[in-house]
């Protein structure tokens, strides 16, 4: 994907293209806005337009270089009214230092200085020109440049840089924001191009809150089951009893000798006889000494 007038180091790798294809970033819509025709590769038989990923990467690199020129990262405002972009813009802001507006865009954020949420950004990046039309409109009033993720049916009014991509899919939105954040860090010099980024694209993907709750409940249930198993093992160890047939039994030979009256010297009775015998022997030794 070598492009004229652009260093080879800025070109997309095979891994980048595979990720874009896997996330369906090339899948457009059936409607086509006339100014988006330059970014369309072809039209399928079912009417869906396919975007040119080469131009997608070209505009993504251009947008990253523009964002990197802003001295104060907080002067870059990333906006996403679309639900699938909420987590993506928050992660983008966390990694690049930008200001995120996730959710409903309050009218007057860029124009009404009396409002508590008033901001004066130098650049804004939006997820969808249709869903974020209010932010683009206010940016045009105060001459703020706009970068937008644009589908084939997106309106390009007041959009300065359009990144052609699928801006309706959960994975496609998250991946474009991920690649944009990574490219911004690389252009700034914060991240080396030779070393992979330790952040996974999945971190930028939207997750259903109910799904998160179910996963947390499953983790809690697993932890409770493991703790209960440990308690049961401890109780079983405390109540452990020897049930072997040899436990507590008497050697048959010893029992037979005892019942037959064969008392050895190691028994208590034998010890008593041994004492008596010892005393007699001692007296005999004394008599023998006197006789001598």
Swiss-Prot record:
<dbReference type="InterPro" id="IPR027498">
    <property type="entry name" value="Ribosomal_uS2_euk"/>
</dbReference>
<keyword id="KW-0689">Ribosomal protein</keyword>
<protein>
    <recommendedName>
        <fullName>Small ribosomal subunit protein uS2A</fullName>
    </recommendedName>
</protein>
<dbReference type="GO" id="GO:0006364">
    <property type="term" value="P:rRNA processing"/>
</dbReference>
<keyword id="KW-0687">Ribonucleoprotein</keyword>
<feature type="region of interest" description="Disordered">
    <location>
        <begin position="265"/>
        <end position="292"/>
    </location>
</feature>
<comment type="function">
    <text>Component of the ribosome, a large ribonucleoprotein complex responsible for the synthesis of proteins in the cell. The small ribosomal subunit (SSU) binds messenger RNAs (mRNAs) and translates the encoded message by selecting cognate aminoacyl-transfer RNA (tRNA) molecules. The large subunit (LSU) contains the ribosomal catalytic site termed the peptidyl transferase center (PTC), which catalyzes the formation of peptide bonds, thereby polymerizing the amino acids delivered by tRNAs into a polypeptide chain.</text>
</comment>
<dbReference type="InterPro" id="IPR023591">
    <property type="entry name" value="Ribosomal_uS2_flav_dom_sf"/>
</dbReference>
<dbReference type="InterPro" id="IPR005707">
    <property type="entry name" value="Ribosomal_uS2_euk/arc"/>
</dbReference>
<dbReference type="GO" id="GO:0042274">
    <property type="term" value="P:ribosomal small subunit biogenesis"/>
</dbReference>
<dbReference type="GO" id="GO:0000028">
    <property type="term" value="P:ribosomal small subunit assembly"/>
</dbReference>
<dbReference type="GO" id="GO:0022627">
    <property type="term" value="C:cytosolic small ribosomal subunit"/>
</dbReference>
<keyword id="KW-0963">Cytoplasm</keyword>
<comment type="similarity">
    <text>Belongs to the universal ribosomal protein uS2 family.</text>
</comment>
<comment type="subunit">
    <text>Component of the small ribosomal subunit (SSU). Mature yeast ribosomes consist of a small (40S) and a large (60S) subunit. The 40S small subunit contains 1 molecule of ribosomal RNA (18S rRNA) and at least 33 different proteins. The large 60S subunit contains 3 rRNA molecules (25S, 5.8S and 5S rRNA) and at least 46 different proteins. Interacts with eS21.</text>
</comment>
<keyword id="KW-0597">Phosphoprotein</keyword>
<feature type="compositionally biased region" description="Polar residues">
    <location>
        <begin position="274"/>
        <end position="285"/>
    </location>
</feature>
<feature type="modified residue" description="Phosphoserine">
    <location>
        <position position="45"/>
    </location>
</feature>
<dbReference type="GO" id="GO:0002181">
    <property type="term" value="P:cytoplasmic translation"/>
</dbReference>
<dbReference type="Pfam" id="PF16122">
    <property type="entry name" value="40S_SA_C"/>
</dbReference>
<dbReference type="InterPro" id="IPR018130">
    <property type="entry name" value="Ribosomal_uS2_CS"/>
</dbReference>
<dbReference type="InterPro" id="IPR032281">
    <property type="entry name" value="Ribosomal_uS2_C"/>
</dbReference>
<keyword id="KW-0690">Ribosome biogenesis</keyword>
<dbReference type="GO" id="GO:0003735">
    <property type="term" value="F:structural constituent of ribosome"/>
</dbReference>
<dbReference type="InterPro" id="IPR001865">
    <property type="entry name" value="Ribosomal_uS2"/>
</dbReference>
<keyword id="KW-0698">rRNA processing</keyword>
<keyword id="KW-0539">Nucleus</keyword>
<dbReference type="Pfam" id="PF00318">
    <property type="entry name" value="Ribosomal_S2"/>
</dbReference>
<dbReference type="GO" id="GO:0005634">
    <property type="term" value="C:nucleus"/>
</dbReference>
<dbReference type="GO" id="GO:0005829">
    <property type="term" value="C:cytosol"/>
</dbReference>
